[in-house]
């Protein structure tokens, strides 16, 4: 399974994959294990999960570094020219960027932001929780240092598995990420210190073998027709938007309009109702129409 995940994500080696219980745990392990220092500048996109933002906020209070938000245009898309100017004015030390929003479906230009950040020697962490299985990822061909993933979303694995993958071509995981969880792993058990290098430095305790095992079969299924799935979902997304626009009182957030915008969008859409609170609308759609939606704030 580790080899399958590494190939699917375009990692350099299978050993670059570390399994955790979730993307949330992976984000905490990476961010808490990294050596943030006072006066560092950390950039985030406006689309980060709370697994990233709450962890960074706790660390900011402790370590006294700065957190800045990457600039966007009037539609909420990242503005690369403005970001380039941001980096010139306050050089980045660390950049966190979501590959695809779980709220609006927007696919962020993460690779281009990573290229810009690397000009200043910054470390780049990308969150692929919503993207993995929806878009093609080839980590070793990018300037992204660390990739976080969730197994239960569009990778179609069971709940209880996630992880992080490091780009060993440009990032030394064992040197730069200190373990934050300690325990047994069946290796060198008489030694009270963890290994200084390798998978066993990070994977401790009893892994969720069942959930991890599902990823191999799930990825096999995805790989049979990823491009075909993307095309079908794109058609369904266009159809949904077309029909929603026929209904008065509905607002579509960050609606893709051009073909380029549709290509940079996964099959996730957020809408609002003029006459209903989101929770009320969700209850009506569920109870009267058997339509399942997620309502309220997203994590």
Where would I find each of the regions flagged by the language model?
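Pyridoxal 5′-phosphate
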Residues: 1-299
